[in-house]
């Protein structure tokens, strides 16, 4: 029943053919259950283990590797001689890599919290209903409640369905509905109809929503929605309809996989076709089929060379290291790929309460009356420092600190704050912070009393736990609270009846202390306290006090003001009718105005500078809040989201104003707005959709159940550490300190990670280009294999993998937060950069082939054959006069492949040292700026020597130890790559500078 809030309670009952006293009949319950189903959220069917495993093989790069492993395995089955064992190493290694990758992927999926399932924690197990089959209230399972049921709720209960209130059985009914609406304080409810068909959930004060908690009071309501039809159920449907999108990095790697598969197919086919003329060479026994299979093996080796097998592992490691660095900055990343996405963030949509502000209500101003004579009224105004619940701060008058005990008015004000209060401060020793116990507004008053210390209590020797309530305790020793007249909507105030506890104070008699909305309280005041005197409240004083309250409540401050007053001679408590709340306003009359306090949820001190950094980095910050527009705009101005004098037309919208716009106007509003106030969950999702239509990468914060759909829809969903389990499980990142500054630090880390990722991806790809050039060149020229597949796997996975991972530790550029967000569709490698890494790769390939060729042609320990003989080595036989005096087995020696492998590894280590910076010279950014890289290079070289020297590794990798002379040649061939890359960097710097000059 969508319109329940519009109708009087009696009309709602008639719609369901039910009475508040009798409830539904068994027949009505049966019909309703058949029509609406059980009152529960359906369980989401999870993926089976088999489905999860198959998902891990959807990546194109993984499928290419799987195909290569399959072909290698088939070819290994046909090997003969000593190569039979080693031939199976390659497919085995590839399969082990894929299995490990799949295990990690499935484990992560299995351990990820399910956001939709987490919603079920807000479903109560039991409910209290009135039905005609039994007298009085009966407890039933919450899932059995149906629309039309008469439901009773009381303090501490979780609301079991969406209810339209029909009767409040206590003075007030307050509900904590923060999980649904994001409101930081509990909300007072009533039973009156709300004639507004467009009211948002925050304004539906006659409704109780499923999953929210009763903070105080007792009430009866009629269930108007159950299960998926509740507001909680609608959120579940929104979340279920959100399809997860692949991150920019995943999309780029997919595209890279597609390009790689096409390139591999073309190159492998070309190698095989080019060598058709060699299929029947004597080396293949004259068999055309054996020759075809031989060159097919070379094509497979080429495929293995072209695939950067270590890339997935290196990327995962780099992202994992990034998450650890982010965790140290209070940003806990739940989804690895989102680390890189943070670097693209162009819009941050942030909650106000707790993220941009401290969510710790603080009194920052107060006043008492200094003089109130005929025609004049002068106020003593004070400011109070401190933005948290910590009882630490100064009270100042102007610029001077004051001792509050010197002002009689402040002593009485502190007394009212301490006694007209049901909340307290508590020191959480585990967290090391002061926390509220009770209402935020009242806790702010408790904290104010501690800061004022009107009786000059000695606080030095107290522990933090004792300090939390020391000054309040002193006041409570002087007066005893007898009872409380709860807050009500009609009088907008609450009061306490107190009697003195000390003999010296008994003569003063009992007092009533009142706090509430200034207009309402001052209207009932007949006098005003000036120091210790009581002076009649004249019209001038009344107007001046109200003008000051209006001034504090508007403009740049928008403080929440509370008036504090005393009734010096209240009726005797025996004469008061406490069970009739309509009489409360009569008891709270003839009041004496004491003072006023102004409080706010203060902005976090560090946020303004972070927003300035975002602006410098080209990131737009948008505040989205459930608060009213005036408060939201004021906070935006204080933080620098809006300029002090900036016109808010087209920059700030309420949810209703946003709804009034056409779809095209809404899109435009999302592109220009800085503030959205009084919004509902659906608004957040629409804002994200509109921003995504402009290709903006959006980070969205949230903490309530209501935020989960938008968190799931945004590229980066950011949940608060203090938020609900639903929000956390729908988000990619959780802020352990709920602080906006941590988001900015995470964005900076994301940019640095992407910059480093580009370096190691290009480093790995240039290595693969070198391997492809090497195999392609040997195949075209008809030379013996310089590298075999198992060696290529070793280089791609291990010797290249370590430096590539270490490149993830490169220091970030100093100007990283001075650049605009990069386009998420920007290619990893394009244009000039592609040429640079192609040039390096071609050099690596040529150097590798040159090393193997040098051993055949020039090494004193080699055969010293001619280049012509080398190109025709497949025709070598005892009968061929071209090879007279040459042992044909020399062409199967391990020395040339060892030379080639050593040059490949050494060249790649030089290439890694060159990758500390994309464009800066080694002289400007030397390798020791990244000590991890130096360690990785040393480790890779050590592993290379390991496979050369330690049995049985030389047999597996088909290598052998080299002589000192041979190592000198390896270095001579490898080191020039540094000079080549330095030259390319120089050209790149000139190219970049010219581009900047043109811009």
From Swiss-Prot:
<keyword id="KW-0256">Endoplasmic reticulum</keyword>
<feature type="binding site">
    <location>
        <position position="706"/>
    </location>
    <ligand>
        <name>ATP</name>
    </ligand>
</feature>
<feature type="modified residue" description="Phosphoserine">
    <location>
        <position position="17"/>
    </location>
</feature>
<feature type="transmembrane region" description="Helical; Name=2">
    <location>
        <begin position="90"/>
        <end position="110"/>
    </location>
</feature>
<feature type="transmembrane region" description="Helical; Name=5">
    <location>
        <begin position="758"/>
        <end position="777"/>
    </location>
</feature>
<feature type="binding site">
    <location>
        <position position="678"/>
    </location>
    <ligand>
        <name>ATP</name>
    </ligand>
</feature>
<dbReference type="Pfam" id="PF00690">
    <property type="entry name" value="Cation_ATPase_N"/>
</dbReference>
<feature type="binding site">
    <location>
        <position position="771"/>
    </location>
    <ligand>
        <name>Ca(2+) 2</name>
    </ligand>
</feature>
<feature type="binding site">
    <location>
        <position position="908"/>
    </location>
    <ligand>
        <name>Ca(2+) 2</name>
    </ligand>
</feature>
<dbReference type="InterPro" id="IPR023214">
    <property type="entry name" value="HAD_sf"/>
</dbReference>
<keyword id="KW-0547">Nucleotide-binding</keyword>
<comment type="function">
    <text>This magnesium-dependent enzyme catalyzes the hydrolysis of ATP coupled with the transport of calcium. Transports calcium ions from the cytosol into the sarcoplasmic/endoplasmic reticulum lumen. Contributes to calcium sequestration involved in muscular excitation/contraction.</text>
</comment>
<feature type="binding site">
    <location>
        <position position="684"/>
    </location>
    <ligand>
        <name>ATP</name>
    </ligand>
</feature>
<comment type="subunit">
    <text>Interacts with sarcolipin (SLN). Interacts with phospholamban (PLN). Interacts with myoregulin (MRLN). Interacts with DWORF. Interacts with VMP1. Interacts with TUNAR; the interaction occurs at low levels in low glucose conditions and is increased by high glucose levels.</text>
</comment>
<feature type="binding site">
    <location>
        <position position="768"/>
    </location>
    <ligand>
        <name>Ca(2+) 2</name>
    </ligand>
</feature>
<feature type="topological domain" description="Cytoplasmic">
    <location>
        <begin position="986"/>
        <end position="999"/>
    </location>
</feature>
<dbReference type="InterPro" id="IPR023298">
    <property type="entry name" value="ATPase_P-typ_TM_dom_sf"/>
</dbReference>
<feature type="disulfide bond">
    <location>
        <begin position="876"/>
        <end position="888"/>
    </location>
</feature>
<dbReference type="GO" id="GO:0033017">
    <property type="term" value="C:sarcoplasmic reticulum membrane"/>
</dbReference>
<keyword id="KW-0106">Calcium</keyword>
<feature type="binding site">
    <location>
        <position position="442"/>
    </location>
    <ligand>
        <name>ATP</name>
    </ligand>
</feature>
<feature type="region of interest" description="Interaction with phospholamban 1">
    <location>
        <begin position="370"/>
        <end position="400"/>
    </location>
</feature>
<keyword id="KW-0812">Transmembrane</keyword>
<feature type="transmembrane region" description="Helical; Name=1">
    <location>
        <begin position="49"/>
        <end position="69"/>
    </location>
</feature>
<dbReference type="Pfam" id="PF00689">
    <property type="entry name" value="Cation_ATPase_C"/>
</dbReference>
<keyword id="KW-0479">Metal-binding</keyword>
<feature type="transmembrane region" description="Helical; Name=4">
    <location>
        <begin position="296"/>
        <end position="313"/>
    </location>
</feature>
<feature type="binding site">
    <location>
        <position position="627"/>
    </location>
    <ligand>
        <name>ATP</name>
    </ligand>
</feature>
<keyword id="KW-1133">Transmembrane helix</keyword>
<feature type="binding site">
    <location>
        <position position="307"/>
    </location>
    <ligand>
        <name>Ca(2+) 1</name>
    </ligand>
</feature>
<feature type="active site" description="4-aspartylphosphate intermediate">
    <location>
        <position position="351"/>
    </location>
</feature>
<feature type="transmembrane region" description="Helical; Name=9">
    <location>
        <begin position="931"/>
        <end position="949"/>
    </location>
</feature>
<feature type="topological domain" description="Cytoplasmic">
    <location>
        <begin position="314"/>
        <end position="757"/>
    </location>
</feature>
<feature type="binding site">
    <location>
        <position position="489"/>
    </location>
    <ligand>
        <name>ATP</name>
    </ligand>
</feature>
<keyword id="KW-0597">Phosphoprotein</keyword>
<feature type="binding site">
    <location>
        <position position="625"/>
    </location>
    <ligand>
        <name>ATP</name>
    </ligand>
</feature>
<dbReference type="InterPro" id="IPR018303">
    <property type="entry name" value="ATPase_P-typ_P_site"/>
</dbReference>
<feature type="transmembrane region" description="Helical; Name=6">
    <location>
        <begin position="788"/>
        <end position="808"/>
    </location>
</feature>
<feature type="transmembrane region" description="Helical; Name=7">
    <location>
        <begin position="829"/>
        <end position="851"/>
    </location>
</feature>
<feature type="binding site">
    <location>
        <position position="353"/>
    </location>
    <ligand>
        <name>Mg(2+)</name>
    </ligand>
</feature>
<keyword id="KW-0703">Sarcoplasmic reticulum</keyword>
<keyword id="KW-0109">Calcium transport</keyword>
């Amino acid at each position: 029943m969508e319109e329940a809030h519009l109708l009087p309670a009696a009309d709602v009952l008639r719609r369901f053919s039910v009475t508040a006293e009798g409830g539904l009949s068994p027949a009505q319950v049966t019909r309703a259950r058949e029509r609406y189903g059980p009152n529960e959220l359906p369980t989401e069917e999870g993926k089976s283990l088999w489905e999860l495993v198959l998902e891990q093989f959807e990546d194109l790069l993984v499928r290419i590797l799987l195909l290569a492993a399959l072909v290698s395995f088939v070819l290994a089955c046909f090997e003969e001689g000593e190569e039979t064992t080693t031939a199976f190493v390659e497919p085995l290694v590839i399969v082990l890599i894929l299995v490990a990758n799949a295990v990690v992927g499935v484990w992560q999926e299995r351990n990820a919290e399910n956001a939709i399932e987490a919603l079920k924690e807000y479903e109560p197990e039991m409910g209290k209903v009135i039905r005609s089959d039994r007298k009085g209230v009966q407890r039933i399972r919450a899932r059995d409640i149906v629309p039309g049921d008469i439901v009773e709720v009381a303090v501490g209960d979780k609301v079991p369905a969406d209810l339209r209130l029909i009767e409040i059985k206590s003075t007030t009914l307050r509900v904590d509905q923060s999980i649904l609406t994001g409101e930081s304080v509990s909300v007072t409810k009533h039973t009156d109809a709300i004639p507004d068909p467009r009211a948002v959930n925050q304004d539906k004060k006659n409704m109780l929503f499923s999953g929210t908690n009763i903070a105080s009071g007792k009430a009866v309501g009629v269930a108007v929605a159950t299960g998926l039809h509740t507001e909680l159920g609608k959120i579940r449907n929104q979340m279920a309809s959100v399809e997860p999108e692949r991150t920019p990095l995943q999309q780029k790697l997919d595209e890279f996989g597609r390009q790689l598969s096409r390139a591999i197919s073309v190159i492998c086919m070309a190698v095989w076709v080019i060598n058709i003329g060699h299929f029947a060479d004597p080396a293949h026994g004259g068999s055309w089929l054996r020759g075809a299979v031989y060159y097919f093996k070379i094509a497979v080796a080429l495929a293995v060379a072209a695939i950067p097998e270590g890339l997935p592992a290196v990327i995962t490691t780099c992202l994992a290291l990034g998450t650890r660095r982010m965790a140290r900055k209070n940003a806990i990343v739940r989804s690895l790929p989102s680390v890189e996405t943070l670097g693209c963030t162009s819009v941050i949509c942030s909650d106000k309460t707790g993220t941009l502000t401290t969510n710790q209500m603080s009194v920052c101003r107060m006043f008492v009356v200094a003089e109130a004579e005929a025609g004049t009224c002068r106020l003593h105004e004070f400011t109070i420092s401190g933005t948290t619940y910590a009882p630490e701060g100064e009270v100042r008058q102007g610029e001077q600190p004051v001792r509050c005990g010197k002002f009689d008015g402040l002593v009485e004000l502190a007394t009212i704050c301490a006694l007209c209060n049901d909340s307290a401060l508590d020191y959480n020793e585990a967290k090391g912070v002061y926390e509220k116990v009770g209402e935020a507004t009242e806790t702010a008053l408790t904290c104010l009393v501690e800061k004022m210390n009107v009786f000059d209590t000695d606080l030095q020797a107290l522990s933090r736990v004792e300090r939390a309530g020391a000054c309040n305790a002193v006041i409570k020793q002087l007066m005893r609270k007898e009872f409380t007249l709860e807050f009500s909507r009609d009088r907008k105030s609450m009061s306490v009846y107190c009697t003195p506890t000390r003999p010296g104070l008994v003569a003063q008699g009992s007092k009533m202390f009142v706090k509430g909305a200034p207009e309402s309280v001052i209207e009932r005041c007949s006098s005003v306290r000036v120091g210790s005197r009581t002076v009649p409240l004249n019209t001038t004083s009344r107007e001046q006090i109200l003008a000051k309250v209006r001034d504090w409540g508007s403009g740049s401050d928008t403080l929440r003001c509370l008036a504090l007053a005393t009734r010096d001679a209240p009726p005797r408590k025996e004469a008061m009718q406490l069970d009739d709340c309509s009489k409360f306003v009569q008891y709270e009359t003839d009041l004496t105005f004491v003072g006023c306090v102004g409080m706010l949820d203060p902005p976090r001190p560090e946020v303004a500078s972070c927003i300035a950094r975002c602006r410098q980095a080209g990131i737009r910050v948008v505040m989205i809040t459930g608060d009213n527009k005036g408060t939201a705009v004021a906070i935006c101005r204080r933080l620098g989201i809006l300029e002090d004098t900036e016109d808010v037309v087209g920059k700030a919208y309420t949810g209703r104003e946003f709804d009034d716009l056409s779809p095209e106007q809404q899109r435009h509003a999302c592109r220009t707005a800085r503030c959205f106030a009084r919004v509902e969950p659906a608004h957040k999702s629409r804002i994200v959709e509109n921003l995504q239509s402009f290709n903006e990468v959006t980070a969205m914060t949230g903490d309530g159940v209501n935020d989960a759909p938008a968190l799931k829809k945004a590229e980066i969903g950011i949940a608060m550490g203090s938020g609900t389990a639903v929000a956390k499980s729908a988000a990619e990142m959780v802020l352990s300190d709920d602080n906006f500054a941590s988001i900015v630090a995470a964005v900076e880390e994301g940019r640095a990670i992407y910059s480093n990722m580009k370096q190691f991806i290009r480093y790995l790809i240039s290595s693969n280009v070198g391997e492809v050039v090497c195999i392609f060149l040997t195949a075209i020229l008809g030379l013996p294999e310089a590298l075999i597949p198992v060696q290529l796997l070793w280089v791609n996975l291990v010797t290249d993998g370590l430096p590539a991972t270490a490149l993830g530790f490169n220091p970030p550029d100093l100007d990283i937060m001075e650049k605009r967000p990069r386009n998420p569709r920007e290619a990893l490698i394009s244009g000039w950069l592609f040429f640079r890494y192609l040039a390096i790769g071609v050099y690596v390939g040529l150097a590798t082939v040159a090393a193997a060729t040098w051993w055949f042609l020039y090494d004193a320990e080699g055969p010293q054959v001619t280049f012509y003989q080398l190109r025709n080595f497949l025709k070598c036989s005892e009968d061929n006069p071209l090879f007279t005096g040459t042992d044909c087995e020399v062409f199967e020696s391990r020395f040339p492949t060892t030379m080639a492998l050593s040059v490949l590894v050494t060249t790649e280590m030089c290439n890694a040292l060159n990758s500390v910076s994309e464009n800066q010279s080694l002289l400007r950014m030397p390798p020791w700026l990244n000590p991890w890289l130096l360690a990785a290079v040393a480790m890779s070289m050590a592993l290379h020597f390991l496979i050369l020297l330690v049995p049985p590794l030389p047999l597996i990798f088909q290598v052998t130890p080299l002589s000192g002379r041979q190592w000198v040649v390896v270095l001579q061939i490898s080191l020039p790559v540094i000079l080549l890359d330095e030259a390319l960097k120089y050209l790149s710097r000139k190219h970049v500078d010219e581009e900047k000059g043109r811009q």
